[in-house]
Regions:
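N-terminal pre-catalytic "stem/leader" segment of glycosyltransferase-like enzymes
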Residues: 1-56
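Conserved catalytic-core segment of nucleotide-activated headgroup transferases in glycan assembly
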Residues: 7, 11-27, 124-127, 132-216
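Extended catalytic core of nucleotide-activated donor transferases of GT-like folds
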Residues: 35-107
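Alpha-helix capping/helix-boundary segments
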Residues: 42-43, 56-57, 102-104, 123, ...
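Donor nucleotide-sugar binding/catalytic pocket of nucleotide-sugar-dependent glycosyltransferases
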Residues: 94-128
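A charged, aromatic-enriched C-terminal amphipathic alpha-helix characteristic of glycosyltransferases
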Residues: 125, 278-313
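Nucleotide-sugar-dependent
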Residues: 148, 201-212, 220-241, 251-261
Length: 317
């Protein structure tokens, strides 16, 4: 049996392709499966399972089916009302996989189809837990450009300046210069106030830079706006990558985050920063336990094995 991963616009820089394609594929390969990213369509036949990742088309799924393959359509964004291909891709594929329980519920509501939940695995190397802030506490946020939509950015910047004072907030994503430029212009015009740009460090994301900053930071600070219906279907990938990196996470209690509540602060972020400063030993203990939990339950090896076994079981029915 061959397992192939495909997207019509495959890009390893895209987190969903990297985690649900590259990382998962490599884990299956290391366990003895014939798994790879699909580049040669002549390989696709009746002995093939093709997993279609983000930005796949109905035409590609049909092509695989025409060549005799079993097909899985993988969803990790709750955009059924925006992306016209989602529903027909789900209907055409033999199976649907999703990145969270709530994404599965949304998929069922929109398509009537059940799905296999395959959480995102961690991809970062394990680092020693550390929490030893100096006079200025180092805070880190990382995410895709679209993740800015779900961050109460102006509120966070203003509250950090008013209520914390001694901090450096580093934020890495795509096109951060545009975000920074927009808010500098708005503050210059008097449309907003209270932002201390000297305490903000906004940089262009790269996988390597994220790793360097995780080593240096004290806290991963990533509050989330919960009013948007897309937020509660998200996976916990940023949280688990932070924990495996040995860093304390302060965030918002999304559904996929709740199982990590014993190891993170999920609530008011200013209170969380203040509590962490006052309880460094407890922070270290939480991070250490959280890191072990992630290592035991969210490795690509564990998740990919469980996933492919469920896929094979479902396809036999």
């Amino acid at each position: 049996m061959k397992i192939r991963f495909f997207s019509d616009a495959y890009k390893s820089k895209r987190a969903s392709h990297r985690l649900r394609g590259d990382v998962t594929c490599q884990a299956l390969l290391e366990q003895g499966y014939d798994a790879k990213i699909l580049t040669d369509w002549s390989e696709v036949d009746a002995d093939t399972i093709v997993i279609f990742l983000k930005r796949s088309s109905v035409a590609s799924i049909q092509r695989a089916r025409d060549q005799g393959a079993k097909t899985i359509y993988d969803l990790c964004d709750n955009k059924f009302e925006e992306k016209g291909e989602y529903e027909p891709c789900c209907q055409l594929a033999d199976l649907v996989s999703v990145n969270s329980v709530n994404m599965g519920i949304s998929t069922k509501n929109f398509t009537g189809k059940n799905s296999i939940v395959m959480p995102d695995p961690y991809e970062r190397p394990k680092l020693s837990p550390r929490f030893a802030p100096g006079v200025d506490i180092n805070l880190l946020w990382f995410g895709s450009q679209s993740s800015f939509k779900f961050l109460p950015i102006l509120e966070v910047w203003s509250r950090l300046e008013k209520e914390i004072g001694n901090y450096c907030y580093t934020m890495i994503s795509a096109k951060t210069d545009r975000v920074l430029g927009k808010f500098k212009l708005r503050q210059a015009k008097g449309a907003v106030s209270g932002i201390n740009f000297d305490r903000l460090d906004m940089r262009e994301w790269s996988w390597e830079l994220q790793g360097q900053l995780l080593e240096q930071t004290d806290i991963v600070l990533m509050p989330v706006l919960t009013e948007n219906p897309r937020t509660d279907t998200k996976s916990a990938n940023r949280l688990i990558d932070s924990l495996i990196s040995g860093r304390f996470v302060i965030t918002t209690p999304l559904h996929s985050y709740l199982e990590f509540a014993p190891y993170t602060w999920q609530g008011d972020y200013i209170e969380g920063i203040q509590w962490a400063r006052n309880n460094p030993e407890q922070v270290l203990d939480m991070v250490t336990q959280g890191q072990k939990y992630v290592e035991d339950n969210y490795s690509a090896r564990v998740l990919s094995k469980r996933f492919i076994e469920e896929v094979i079981d479902q396809l036999r029915k």
